Amino acid sequence: MPELPEVETSRRGIEPHLVGATILHAVVRNGRLRWPVSEEIYRLSDQPVLSVQRRAKYLLLELPEGWIIIHLGMSGSLRILPEELPPEKHDHVDLVMSNGKVLRYTDPRRFGAWLWTKELEGHNVLTHLGPEPLSDDFNGEYLHQKCAKKKTAIKPWLMDNKLVVGVGNIYASESLFAAGIHPDRLASSLSLAECELLARVIKAVLLRSIEQGGTTLKDFLQSDGKPGYFAQELQVYGRKGEPCRVCGTPIVATKHAQRATFYCRQCQK
């Protein structure tokens, strides 16, 4: 599933082609996504794009009459293409732009979303979200406070959007490795110093992935069709049985809440 770096990479890739241009119309080939594509999107016509923003894993396209909310789901990606390029099997939604380009949404598993709202504030998919991990609001003191009474393992807690948004399976595993923290540790057992370190490395790992265009394991593509190259720098995720790049110990894979977790039993305590 695309996580924060992949969504932010998509935002940065499509923004220059959308802001200042006008959506002439939308083409919805298959509206049966995780939720049905909102009827308002079918009727889009002559709507200038004012901004392209991101909140958590949602892309937010600001138009004069409202907002398009896009979630990439498990396998979605957005590409900027020439209008004349014919669609392929899993190309479900196009926004045809006034500059001769098209924003094309591809999603083999159809678990993403294209929603419409007049107002962002109070929309059900955006409520109850924690702070952005790259913001000043997410820091060691905040993390320590939220972990203090949490009797659950730190790995699934990091993936809870109420704690912090956008840190999914890949980046939780990678960040815990970078901080030297075992994923099975109780959140409440982390000291303030450990939380400060963990908050710092989460930011560093996410920023590095954004620099590399995110992580492509299967379906994700950047807006120009290129894969995300952070996959080449993964330290533990997807490396079960391979030697740790630091100590040589074989990487271990377990499951938390049906999600794969990768770690080094020597480097993470």
Swiss-Prot record:
Reactions catalysed, as given in the entry: Hydrolysis of DNA containing ring-opened 7-methylguanine residues, releasing 2,6-diamino-4-hydroxy-5-(N-methyl)formamidopyrimidine; 2'-deoxyribonucleotide-(2'-deoxyribose 5'-phosphate)-2'-deoxyribonucleotide-DNA = a 3'-end 2'-deoxyribonucleotide-(2,3-dehydro-2,3-deoxyribose 5'-phosphate)-DNA + a 5'-end 5'-phospho-2'-deoxyribonucleoside-DNA + H(+)
Active site (record annotation): P2 (schiff-base intermediate with dna), E3 (proton donor), K57 (proton donor), R259 (proton donor)
Domain of life: Bacteria
Pfam families (alphabetical): Fapy_DNA_glyco (PF01149), H2TH (PF06831), zf-FPG_IleRS (PF06827)
GO MF annotation terms: 8-oxo-7,8-dihydroguanine DNA N-glycosylase activity; class I DNA-(apurinic or apyrimidinic site) endonuclease activity; damaged DNA binding; DNA N-glycosylase activity; DNA-(apurinic or apyrimidinic site) endonuclease activity; endonuclease activity; metal ion binding; oxidized purine nucleobase lesion DNA N-glycosylase activity
EC number: 3.2.2.23, 4.2.99.18
The protein's required cofactors: Zn(2+)
Cysteines paired by S-S bonds: none
SMART domains, sorted: Fapy_DNA_glyco, H2TH
The keyword DNA damage is annotated on this UniProt entry: yes
Record text on subunit structure and interactions: Monomer.
This protein's name: Formamidopyrimidine-DNA glycosylase
